[in-house]
């Protein structure tokens, strides 16, 4: 748990989950241009930029994120936007959501540099 009060997981916990093959959605809330610089390639990855989410709200969420009880791990560049989106989802009834602390930048620095950094 972070000072913002939203549930969090570390980049190490994310790596363990990615390697375990478990069932969850990795929701990347970065803007489209950011994906050109760094991305975790995984079939569980779904992308919805924060700007699109702010505009369209719940209608913008991918189908895989509609299950309010399914596990959703939210990632962004450094963890700020993912914490905001995690809070937003929790206030709208999602129950199993966590922000990835440090974001994709932390993942690239601590786990896998091949995902890229910017």
Task: Tell where the protein language model's regions lie, with residue ranges.
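Rhodanese-like catalytic fold shared by cysteine-dependent sulfurtransferases
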Residues: 1-25, 32-71, 80-118
């Amino acid at each position: 748990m972070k000072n913002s009060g939203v549930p969090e997981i570390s980049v190490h916990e994310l790596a363990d989950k990615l390697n375990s093959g478990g069932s969850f959605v990795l929701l990347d809330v970065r803007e489209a241009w950011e994906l050109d610089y760094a991305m975790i390639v995984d079939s569980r990855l779904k992308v919805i930029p924060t700007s699109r989410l702010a505009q369209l709200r719940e209608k913008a969420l991918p189908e895989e994120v509609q299950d309010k009880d399914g596990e959703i791990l939210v990632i962004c560049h450094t963890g700020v936007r993912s914490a905001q989106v995690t809070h937003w989802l929790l206030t709208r009834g999602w129950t199993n959501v966590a922000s990835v602390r440090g974001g994709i930048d932390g993942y690239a620095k601590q786990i896998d540099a091949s995902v890229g950094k910017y």
